[in-house]
């Protein structure tokens, strides 16, 4: 497994990267820990970090507008993050039109990717490269909602201890918004299971 998935890459935040999926929780943690460099520690993010990221997006979104509009903008962004993330993420029920020339999409579970342009006019499960549309990037944080579930280090429940966050392109954005938390076991992997890591010194 590890010879096929080297962990010597430098971590970057950029558009048009392929989602790293089909990874079990423990594999994701091993990969995340190996993506450190220059004294930086790396790991899967903790649940509290996920929640603080959502709060950061909320506060920065509100800060960016004039005082008269702040209450409405706060209501809207909280709804988008907590109740219905359809319009800010790649979900089954989000009908989008990808116009970024370097973005790619997959209609066969990530086996092959095709170069956009692509317009989704019916509900369908389409996997995208990162940041494929500007609406999926909130404060330069890509795909916090939809596309693939992301493993975190938080505990979920006794039967399904490993938490996944944020929903996926196979689900509905109103049922699995960015704040959503589900549980799985360490043995599970899948097309819509990926991970997000944190870096700190």
Please report, for each region that a protein language model flagged, where it lies by residue:
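Residue-level signal for functionally critical sites in structured catalytic/ligand-binding pockets
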Residues: 1, 47, 150, 194-196
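Short aromatic-cysteine micro-motif
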Residues: 1-143, 201
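Disulfide-stabilized, aromatic/cysteine-rich ligand-recognition loop
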Residues: 19-26, 30-33, 45, 128-136, ...
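Short, well-ordered loop/turn and helix-capping segments at boundaries between secondary-structure elements
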Residues: 59, 154-157
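Active-site-proximal beta-strands of protease catalytic cores
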Residues: 146-154
């Amino acid at each position: 497994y590890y010879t096929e998935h080297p962990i010597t890459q430098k971590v970057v935040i950029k558009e048009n990267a392929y989602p790293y999926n089909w990874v079990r929780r423990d594999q994701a943690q091993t990969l995340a820990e190996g993506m450190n460099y220059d004294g930086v520690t790396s790991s899967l993010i903790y649940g509290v970090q996920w929640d603080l990221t959502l709060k950061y997006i909320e506060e920065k979104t509100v800060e960016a507008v004039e005082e008269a509009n702040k209450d409405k903008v706060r209501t809207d962004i909280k709804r988008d993050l907590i109740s219905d993330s359809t319009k800010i993420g790649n979900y089954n029920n989000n009908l989008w039109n990808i116009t970024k020339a370097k973005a790619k999409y997959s209609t066969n579970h990530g086996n092959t990717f095709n170069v956009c342009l692509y317009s989704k006019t019916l509900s369908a499960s389409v996997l995208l490269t990162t940041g494929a549309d500007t609406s999926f990037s909130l404060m330069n944080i890509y795909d916090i909602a939809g596309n693939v579930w992301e493993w975190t280090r938080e505990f979920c429940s006794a039967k399904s201890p490993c938490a996944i966050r944020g929903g996926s392109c196979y689900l509905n954005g109103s049922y699995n918004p960015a704040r959503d938390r589900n549980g799985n076991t360490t043995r599970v992997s899948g097309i819509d299971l990926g991970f997000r890591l944190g870096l700190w010194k």
